[in-house]
Every structure is written in C-alpha cells, then in structure tokens.
From Swiss-Prot:
CDD domains tied to this protein: HisA
SUPFAM superfamilies given in the database record: Ribulose-phoshate binding barrel
Location within or outside the cell: Cytoplasm
Primary location class: cytoplasm
Phylogenetic classification of the source organism: Bacteria, Bacillati, Bacillota, Clostridia, Eubacteriales
Name of the molecule in the record: 1-(5-phosphoribosyl)-5-[(5-phosphoribosylamino)methylideneamino] imidazole-4-carboxamide isomerase
Pathway(s) it belongs to: Amino-acid biosynthesis; L-histidine biosynthesis; L-histidine from 5-phospho-alpha-D-ribose 1-diphosphate: step 4/9
Swiss-Prot/TrEMBL keywords: Amino-acid biosynthesis, Cytoplasm, Histidine biosynthesis, Isomerase
Assigned EC number: 5.3.1.16
One record GO biological process: L-tryptophan biosynthetic process
Residue ranges crossing the lipid bilayer per the database entry: none
One GO MF term: 1-(5-phosphoribosyl)-5-[(5-phosphoribosylamino)methylideneamino]imidazole-4-carboxamide isomerase activity
InterPro entries (alphabetical): Aldolase_TIM, His_biosynth, HisA_bact_arch, Isoase_HisA-like, Isoase_HisA-like_bact, RibuloseP-bd_barrel
GO cellular component: cytoplasm
Length: 244
C-alpha cells in the first residue's frame, strides 16, 4: 500500500484546513518545496498536492509553489484543486505532475473526463471522489450534490477511470480515523482502485486500511497527522509496506 503525504497549498504556503473550511486554517510552512523535500528524504515515493485556492476559485492558483516542489524532488506527485480546463491539466502535467485529480468538473461534465482519458490515459487522470453522508461533495466541499457517491464511482469507472481518491469530508482534518466501512463499500461496489483520504491519524488506521487491500484499497493520504506529529512518516511507510 502506498502512503501519500499531503501538501495543501494556500497563498503559496503549506497549510491544513479542517473539513475544507478556510476559517479553520493552520499554516505549517512558508516553503512547501522544503516540506516536499523532507517527505522525500524520509522515504516517501509519491506526494499528494492540493491547490486549495484553485479548488475554491476554479482554476490553478499556486503554480509557482507547485513548480518549486517539482524542482525540489525526484519522486512522483499528483495534483488536484480547480482543474476544470484542458489547458490547466496540460500545464500541471508539463510541470512534472505524474497524475492530476479531477473532482467537481467530473460531476457536472463527465465528457470532460472522457476527453482527458482519451488524451492522457487512465494512468494520469485520477478521480477525486469527495463524499458527505454518501453523496458527492463539490466546489471545494462547499456544496453537496444529489448524486450518490457509489453511483458516481460506477459512472466514472464505465468511462474508463481506474483510480479514485475517496475522501470522506466529514472526517477530514479531524484525526478521528477513516470511515473504513464506507471505503470498503466504495472499493468493492465500484471496482475502482481506491486511495483513502480523510481522518488517517494512527498506525492502527494504516493497518486497518492495509487489510482492505484485497478489496481494492491501494493507498492512503496522510496530512494533518504528519504535521501534528501523531504519526511519523517513516513508521507509516514501514507499516504500509509490511507483510502480515
């Protein structure tokens, strides 16, 4: 199982929000590239980067910071947040992103996903599937759609999506542990390769997610728990790679 340390960008800084709310912001670093380099030095193989300003404004806003991160590391990274135009996707892939994450736009314009898959392939286009009480959350989690998260996952799988980052919005940044039942149901019901996000806050959580590997859970994104010292990245990586 792959552990993805998270870097959330706002105004060029590395921050964390609680449940996606800007008023619940903690700034962890003015130099996100240094944070990225530190994660690489500790053994991470893949980073998860979110442009929070982009998510709220609908187009990438932290390209300078992302470019600096790309220059600072030799490992893979995926980026999401406000990717609603083909040109923005092309820009991020050109900056060195291994994968881009499409969320809101996939809900309102499934044809956009189909076009991206056709142009770049499923290895480079990942679905950002954010859910609140079983329904798809959109627009930087500000609103909830009337679409069931599982139905949406099935629809995207039918279009050719292979990998989805599944975030339970109600758990994000609260360090309460992931919603294991919902994650397992999403993976087994849709057949998508699921990267779990939201609430991972202990090595026990990582062990529990690792037990869902056979159901289709291939990774976990960890943010706040790393920054607050609840989990050490080296320990998390060791746990994720261990054989039972």
């Amino acid at each position: 199982m792959i552990i993805y340390p998270a870097i959330d960008l706002k105004d060029g800084q590395c921050v964390r929000l609680v449940q996606g709310r800007v008023e619940n912001k903690t700034v962890y670093s003015d130099a996100p590239a240094n944070v990225a380099r530190s994660f690489q030095e500790q053994g991470a193989s893949f980073l998860h980067i979110v442009d929070l300003d982009g998510a709220f404004q609908g187009s990438p806003q932290n390209l300078k910071a992302i470019e600096a991160i790309a220059a600072a590391i030799d490992i893979s990274f995926q980026v999401g947040g406000g990717l609603r135009q083909l040109s923005d996707v092309e820009k991020l892939l050109a900056l060195g992103a291994s994968r881009v994450i499409i969320g809101t736009r996939a809900v309102s314009h499934p044809d956009f996903i189909a076009n991206l898959l056709d142009k770049f392939g499923p290895e480079r286009i990942v679905l950002g599937l954010d859910a609140k009480e079983g329904m798809v959350a959109v627009e930087g989690w500000v609103s909830t759609s009337s679409v069931s998260a599982i139905d949406f996952g099935l629809q995207m799988k039918a279009l050719g999506i292979q990998t989805a980052i599944y975030t339970d919005v109600s758990r994000d940044g609260l360090l309460q542990g992931p919603n294991l039942a919902a994650i397992k149901e999403m993976a087994s019901s849709t057949g998508l390769d699921i990267i779990a996000s939201g609430g991972v806050s202990s090595l026990d959580n990582i062990r529990a997610l690792k037990e869902l590997e056979n159901d289709g859970v291939s990774g976990a994104i960890i943010g706040k728990a790393l920054y607050d010292g609840k989990i050490g990245l080296v320990d998390a990586l060791r746990e994720a790679e261990s054989k039972f």
